[in-house]
């Protein structure tokens, strides 16, 4: 007994040390604690919690540790305890809750009870702790306020506590919550019951019937939101934000009241900023999650806009602002930043059709206000709504731009800054139309603003706006301004370099260096004349700017040098390439000493990749130096944590952590530092593999080992995309090592790629993975997939197609929704486009499999056949029919003559769809009929005969050559050629040929153009009388066809077809008179094209 007491005493000391501010003591205590067996931990912790004479901090610490133990290691610890110990723990916890007098301690024990209850619901939903439920019911109707609080706290923490009995107890739960929400005497009970109600609704987010059943709790809930805010407690308001985010439909019956309350709280300046911003967050969140529902309440939206603008006016006067050299991060808690962000999101959520007419007048009034804060807010508001109101603002952009440019001359520097901001934002939001319309005014105004020497913040922001402008500016528009731009940028750079040396200021210089880089990037080879003006100074900065506070400047200068090098090309850059490489190598050697957050790292990594593009194969020599740090950065592992709500309260986003709510009181946290750098590094590895090919072979093994696991790196989309992109490129690099090495590498990636197609949650990333997988199969060819691969892939593709049809049905349901409007239709169209894009990737994968495996793969394909047949049904949307036909085109092209087995499914639709209203469907059908003639066996002959008049009808229709129809028409012309070439006995070739010649050349569809030119060569080389005409009278027409093909770049000079065409021309050249006659009938452009063909083929 004494030994146990001594051990418990030791444990109290340990708890004290776990709370120690001394890092060494605390670390040692954590190690000791970790080594105590789980069952002993439970005993010690419970004993500490029970002991009311122990220090308060130690008891609270014990409660937190016990909850964490049950949360993270329940299965290892609890089931192994003897059943009497389990029973004792359960009754002990309920006893402590009833006896505990300290409110905060009671809460912590309730958290333990909730955690235990969560783990005691079995797989069938049975609650294995009936005494816990009984305690809940007894306590909630107790006279003791502490016990009522405890019951609500447990229910809030674990709303699923009723398990499979929830439906049975639904009315009881509702009564319990209503009763507590009406408790006028105890605000804490009202607050807790409101939070518990929200938690319960959120836990049942897909149960629409339950929303209706609980709708009458909403008025009481909203009252609790209001009351708690005025008691300086925003927890219920946060619950309302969560409901707006996750289950906005629950709010529908009382949406007006919800919005009115949020509006009132947002506008009440007696509340603190955080509460007002949270109230605004309710409305803004609804504009994102229930836009159609909110659009019906235009009165609220109209009242919310002035509130956001009023917040944006809430700015501090700051004497040092204009010449601060360090850019402090925006104060994200400030009303001004919150208002601007809310406005941006609301404009995107609700759309410009609603928002712009409401806000336009407000902004115009603000811009005329004598107080600078209003003018600043008005301009920032214009910047914020550009993305959401894009379509509506485009129509009045001229007056907006003219007005904004006036404010670049405003007497107040912060207004001039905001005007730069608006110009920069519009240059991005409305590119390239903005640049095309306003280049003259904008460039002149920004260059003038950059001369504002007394206000470097304004100067720097004008340079930043210029960067935005030039990044998206068409090269041809920028060229006329180059002299003037360069002159200004150079003089400012020289001046700011002096200031850096004299005063140490660098803010403007950082931006100007990037402006130079951006101009060079757009101007490309036209920047050559200015190269020598900038390069010496830029090299000087990299050599000398070695102090810690100049790291960003140095990084940006490295970027600038590499972008200029890429712009001017290898020949001009070579004079400095060796110097620059030495500078970079020196930086690289110091790389290992750099701190992880050093801004130079990502600039360095990107610069190396640009140097690789400039130097090509010569870059290979630098790989040993570059690859170490690059792999180190690409291998960064982010800090992650699984936290429950209690732990969350001690964390904040300011520490660089971001959280995702997983429901059930759990959150997933990730420290985001280093993620962008990791993504950049992975993209650079892709760049090296692409540029260096076999020169990168030495590194393929380590890179593939890094990249394959990154297909599951769900913290950053860019990393997964780079991982996927790298796979086929790495296989190409590895080819030189021979088939065995290549196959080993493919085996290492294949499983992971197939699994990633099945599990990838983001459609943009998924399409990249599918595309890469298809490319890999093309590289590896026949035999690269085993039976297990085929089985898994078949299941995944089947699931993707089924999901495609299911999503279409869901969209039809949404079109019947009471809130359906034209903006909803726009977002449904976007979803549809996403789905179709995935369908194109399914087609890509099947194409690569058919082209590699031929007819051997048809038995496997049969599991997908009903779904592909469904795609080409007449009632399906045109993209479905287009891609369904493309898949059958591949079956015919690669699996004939065996493909005829499936002809009953696709032949009739294919013949029918040649005349479809949609050009994309016509094109896919026509291509199919062409490959049917080319590759199909004799069984297809009668269908070639049937196809011909249908194809001719499309070609001869009046609008067959318009932009949207031309590709389909050219496929029809090519198909007619293939029928004549490969199935000549199915049609009257003599009759069709003159028509076919009159339709040539093809110039849009380059692949089909080559096919038709090859057939034309066959006919000419065999001296076909109809083609050449009596006494070669058709030759001038043939020359004209060849010349047009050359002019439209339909003839690739490296293609054997080009040599055949050139030989036709040369033969005519030898018979003088005929040559003169042919050439005489060509225009000067056509003559030049014939000469170009002769020179190059």
Swiss-Prot record:
The modification N-acetylalanine is found at residue 2. Its main location: cytoplasm. The keyword Acetylation applies. It is found in: Cytoplasm; Nucleus; Nucleus, Nucleolus. InterPro entries: ARM-like (IPR011989), ARM-type_fold (IPR016024), HEAT (IPR000357), Importin-beta_N (IPR001494), Importin_beta (IPR040122), Importin_rep_4 (IPR041653), Importin_rep_5 (IPR040928), Importin_rep_6 (IPR041389). Residues 325-375 are annotated as: Ran-GTP binding. HEAT repeats lie at residues 5-38, 43-77, 95-122, 130-157, 167-201, 210-246, 254-289, 298-350, 352-386, 390-430, 432-472, 475-523, 525-568, 570-615, 617-692, 695-737, 741-780, 787-853, 856-895, 903-935, 943-983, 990-1021, 1032-1067, 1070-1093. It holds the Pfam family HEAT. Belongs to the importin beta family. Importin beta-3 subfamily. Functions in nuclear protein import as nuclear transport receptor. Serves as receptor for nuclear localization signals (NLS) in cargo substrates. Is thought to mediate docking of the importin/substrate complex to the nuclear pore complex (NPC) through binding to nucleoporin and the complex is subsequently translocated through the pore by an energy requiring, Ran-dependent mechanism. At the nucleoplasmic side of the NPC, Ran binds to the importin, the importin/substrate complex dissociates and importin is re-exported from the nucleus to the cytoplasm where GTP hydrolysis releases Ran. This is Importin-5. It comes from Homo sapiens (Human). The lineage of its organism: Eukaryota, Metazoa, Chordata, Craniata, Vertebrata. The gene is IPO5.
């Amino acid at each position: 007994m004494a030994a146990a007491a001594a051990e418990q005493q030791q444990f109290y000391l340990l708890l004290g040390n776990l709370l120690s501010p001394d890092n060494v003591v605390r670390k040692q205590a954590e190690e000791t604690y970790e080594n105590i067996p789980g069952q002993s931990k439970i005993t010690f912790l419970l004993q500490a919690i029970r002991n009311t004479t122990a220090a308060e901090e130690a008891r609270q610490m014990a409660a937190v540790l016990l909850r964490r133990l049950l949360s993270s290691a329940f299965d290892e610890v609890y089931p192994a305890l003897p059943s009497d110990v389990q029973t004792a723990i359960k009754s002990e916890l309920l006893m402590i809750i009833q006896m505990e007098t300290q409110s905060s301690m009671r809460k912590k024990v309730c958290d333990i009870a909730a955690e235990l209850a969560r783990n005691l619901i079995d797989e069938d939903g049975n609650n294995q702790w009936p005494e816990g439920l009984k305690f809940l019911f007894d306590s909630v109707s107790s006279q003791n306020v502490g016990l009522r609080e405890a019951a609500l706290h447990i229910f809030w923490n674990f709303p699923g506590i009723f398990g499979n009995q929830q439906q049975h107890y639904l009315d009881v739960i509702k009564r319990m919550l209503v009763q507590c929400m009406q408790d006028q005497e105890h605000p804490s009970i009202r607050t807790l019951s409101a939070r518990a109600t929200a938690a319960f609704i959120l836990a049942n987010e897909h149960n629409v019937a339950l929303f209706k059943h609980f709708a009458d709790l909403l008025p009481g809930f909203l009252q609790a939101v209001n009351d708690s805010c005025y008691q300086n407690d925003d927890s219920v308001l946060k619950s309302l934000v969560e409901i707006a985010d996750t289950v906005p439909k629950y709010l529908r019956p009382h949406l007006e009241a919800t919005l009115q309350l949020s509006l009132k709280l947002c506008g009440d300046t007696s509340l603190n900023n955080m509460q007002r911003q949270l109230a605004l967050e309710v409305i803004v969140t609804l504009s994102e999650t229930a836009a159609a529902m909110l659009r019906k309440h235009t009165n609220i939206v109209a009242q919310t806009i002035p509130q956001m603008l009023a917040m944006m006016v809430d700015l501090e006067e700051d004497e040092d602002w204009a010449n601060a050299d360090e850019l402090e991060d925006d104060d994200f808690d400030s009303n001004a930043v919150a208002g601007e962000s809310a406005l941006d999101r609301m404009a995107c959520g609700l759309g410009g059709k609603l928002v712009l007419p409401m806000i336009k007048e407000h902004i115009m009034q603000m811009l005329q206000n004598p107080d600078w804060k209003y003018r600043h807010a008005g301009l920032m508001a214009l910047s914020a709504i550009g993305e959401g109101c894009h379509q509506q603002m485009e129509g009045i952009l001229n007056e907006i731009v003219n007005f904004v440019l006036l404010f670049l001359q405003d007497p107040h520097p912060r207004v001039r800054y905001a005007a730069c901001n608006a110009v920069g934002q519009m240059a991005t939001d409305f590119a390239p139309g903005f640049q095309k319309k306003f280049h003259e005014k904008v460039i002149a105004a920004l260059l003038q603003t950059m001369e504002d020497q007394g206000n470097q913040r304004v100067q720097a922001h004008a340079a930043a706006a210029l960067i935005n402008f030039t990044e998206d500016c068409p090269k041809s528009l920028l060229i006329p301004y180059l002299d003037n731009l360069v002159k200004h940028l150079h003089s400012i750079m020289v001046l700011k370099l002096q200031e850096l040396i004299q005063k140490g200021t660098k803010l403007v210089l950082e931006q100007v260096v990037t402006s130079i880089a951006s101009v060079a990037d757009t101007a490309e080879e036209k920047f050559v004349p200015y190269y020598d003006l900038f390069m010496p100074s830029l090299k000087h900065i990299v050599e000398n700017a070695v102090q810690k506070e100049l790291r960003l400047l140095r990084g940006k200068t490295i970027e600038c040098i590499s972008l200029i090098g890429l712009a001017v090309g290898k020949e001009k850059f070579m004079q400095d390439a060796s110097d620059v490489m030495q500078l970079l190598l020196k930086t690289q050697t110091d790389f290992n000493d750099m701190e992880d957050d050093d801004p130079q790292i990502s600039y360095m990594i990107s610069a190396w990749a640009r140097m690789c593009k400039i130097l090509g194969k010569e870059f290979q020599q630098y790989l040993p130096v570059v690859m170490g740090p690059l792999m180190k950065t690409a291998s960064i592992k982010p800090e992650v944590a699984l936290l429950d709500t209690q732990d969350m309260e001690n964390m904040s986003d300011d520490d660089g952590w971001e959280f995702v709510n997983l429901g059930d009181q759990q959150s997933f946290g990730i420290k985001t530092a280093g993620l962008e750098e990791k993504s950049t590094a992975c993209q650079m590895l892709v760049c090296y593999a692409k540029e260096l090919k076999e020169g990168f072979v030495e590194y393929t093994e380590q890179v593939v080992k890094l990249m394959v696991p990154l297909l599951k790196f769900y913290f950053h989309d860019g990393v997964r995309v780079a991982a996927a992109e790298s796979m086929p490129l790495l296989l190409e690099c590895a080819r030189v090592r021979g088939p065995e090495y290549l196959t080993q590498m493919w085996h290492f990636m294949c499983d992971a790629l197939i699994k990633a197609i099945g599990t990838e949650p983001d459609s943009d990333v998924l399409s990249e993975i599918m595309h890469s997988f298809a490319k890999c199969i093309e590289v590896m060819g026949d035999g690269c997939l085993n039976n297990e691969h085929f089985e898994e892939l078949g299941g995944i593709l089947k699931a993707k197609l089924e999901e495609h049809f299911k999503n279409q049905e869901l969209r039809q349901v949404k079109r019947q929704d009471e809130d359906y409007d034209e903006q909803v239709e726009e977002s449904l169209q976007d979803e549809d486009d996403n789905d179709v894009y995935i369908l194109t990737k399914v087609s890509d994968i099947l194409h690569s499999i058919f082209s590699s495996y031929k007819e051997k793969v048809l038995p496997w394909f049969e599991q997908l056949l009903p779904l592909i047949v469904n795609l080409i049904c007449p009632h399906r949307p045109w993209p479905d029919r287009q891609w369904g036909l493309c898949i059958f085109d591949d079956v015919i092209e690669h699996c004939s003559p065996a493909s005829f087995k499936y002809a009953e499914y696709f032949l009739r639709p294919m013949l029918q769809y040649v005349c479809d209203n949609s050009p994309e469907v016509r094109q896919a059908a026509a291509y199919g009929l062409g490959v049917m003639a080319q590759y199909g066996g004799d069984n297809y002959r009668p269908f070639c005969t049937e196809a011909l008049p249908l194809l001719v009808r499309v070609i001869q229709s009046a609008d067959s050559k318009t932009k949207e129809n031309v590709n389909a028409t050219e496929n029809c012309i090519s198909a007619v050629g293939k029928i004549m070439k490969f199935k000549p006995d199915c049609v009257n070739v003599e009759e069709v040929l003159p028509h076919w010649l009159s339709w040539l050349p093809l110039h849009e569809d380059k692949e089909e153009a080559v096919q038709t030119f090859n057939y034309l060569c066959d006919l000419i080389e065999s001296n076909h009388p109809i083609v050449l005409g009596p006494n070669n009278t058709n030759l001038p027409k043939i020359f004209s066809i060849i010349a047009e093909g050359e002019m439209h770049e339909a003839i690739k000079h490296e293609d054997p077809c080009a040599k055949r065409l050139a030989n036709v021309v040369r033969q005519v050249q030898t018979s003088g008179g005929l040559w003169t006659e042919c050439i005489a009938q060509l225009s000067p452009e056509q003559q030049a094209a014939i000469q170009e063909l002769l020179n190059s083929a």
